[in-house]
């Protein structure tokens, strides 16, 4: 579909529900129509290095995958996959089932949730407590254990892959210098050999963890914005469906995103509460090496967030992006200082 077609559907309310006009939220890979009762996600016809939505058949497949995978943690939120068909009035509608009309695209049908209950918003309001973190751990630990990958069925990234992923930040040294000062490019130069050394020292342990069953077919994008904290319990949504390689990972890498996000938001005690509760349910940290790996993965997740914030700041020069960059820079510096003290030990 095109943006024009999607916006026409939204304006006309041509979808299941009350029929009022919907708000359209656009990302680089999808449009999401937010109605009063429901939300509908339509995938853009794009092919990128990490996904392929270029044909209707591919989009239909990944819509079904999105519903299937997200029902693991949000069964009441992900309702179905609906077809998009032309209407007799010359427009298009979501949810028609007219066998005489062609299906031109597909939409993921979701229950509309209360955005004010998103965890990132609640963290900024100081409205998240230890009980919320315990409830989240009680949801995620059994989920991860149930989706652990058997030894021999998963081959993790190579040492070169790990380094290349982290080193993606380093070409942003000039932008980082403009925003964060001279300390940023100096730190990047220091971190390059540190990361190489760390990966060389710990890659064998990562392989051992694969054999020990600590890699999972998980969520893949586990951060606070993808969590609703509801009265009846947490709902974790919007997992990665389009590339299983981004979803199959060491559980420490999965948890690191959430822990880093909470720590970057200035609530390290809540991160500790979550990890303690989680480890009681699944002791996936067996030795000190694993603690160091968790810090490395937190550093990697902060690295990626910093890079995105630098990109947004360079393009838009907005203070919000600058604040996010400073926020992630702060926690990244702390993680890397910890690794510098422990690498080689």
Model-derived regions: residue spans:
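ATP/Mg2+ or Mg2+-diphosphate-binding catalytic cores
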Residues: 307-345
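Conserved ATP-binding subdomain of kinase catalytic cores across diverse folds
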Residues: 3-219, 224-304
């Amino acid at each position: 579909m095109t943006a024009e077609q999607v916006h026409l559907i939204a304006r006309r309310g041509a979808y299941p529900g009350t029929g009022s006009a919907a708000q359209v939220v656009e990302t680089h890979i999808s449009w999401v129509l937010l109605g009063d009762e429901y939300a509908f996600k339509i995938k853009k016809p794009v092919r990128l290095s990490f996904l392929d939505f270029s044909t209707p058949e591919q989009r239909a497949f990944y819509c079904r995958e999105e519903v299937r995978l997200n029902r693991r943690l949000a069964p009441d939120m992900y309702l179905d996959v609906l077809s998009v068909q032309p209407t007799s009035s010359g427009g298009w509608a979501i949810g028609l089932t007219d066998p005489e009309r062609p299906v031109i695209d597909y939409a993921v049908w979701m229950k509309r949730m209360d955005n004010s209950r998103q965890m990132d918003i609640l963290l900024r309001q100081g409205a998240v407590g230890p009980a919320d973190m315990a409830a989240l751990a009680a949801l995620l630990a059994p989920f991860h254990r149930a989706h652990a990958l058997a030894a021999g069925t998963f081959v993790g990234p190579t040492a070169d892959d790990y380094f290349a992923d982290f080193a993606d930040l380093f070409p942003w040294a000039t932008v980082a210098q403009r925003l964060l000062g001279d300390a940023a490019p100096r730190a990047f130069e220091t971190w390059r050999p540190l990361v190489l050394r760390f990966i060389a020292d710990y890659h064998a342990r990562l392989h051992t963890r694969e054999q020990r069953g600590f890699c999972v077919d998980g969520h893949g994008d586990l951060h606070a914005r993808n969590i609703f904290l509801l009265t009846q319990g947490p709902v974790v949504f919007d997992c990665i469906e389009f590339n299983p390689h981004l979803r199959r990972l060491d559980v420490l890498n999965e948890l690191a995103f959430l822990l880093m996000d909470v720590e970057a938001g200035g609530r390290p005690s809540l991160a500790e509460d979550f990890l303690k509760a989680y480890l009681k349910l699944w002791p996936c940290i067996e030795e000190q090496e694993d603690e160091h790996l968790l810090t490395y993965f937190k550093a990697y997740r902060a690295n990626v967030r910093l890079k995105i914030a630098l990109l947004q700041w360079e393009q838009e020069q907005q203070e919000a992006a600058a604040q996010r960059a400073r926020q992630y820079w702060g926690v990244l510096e702390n993680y890397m200082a910890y690794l510098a003290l422990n690498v080689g030990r």
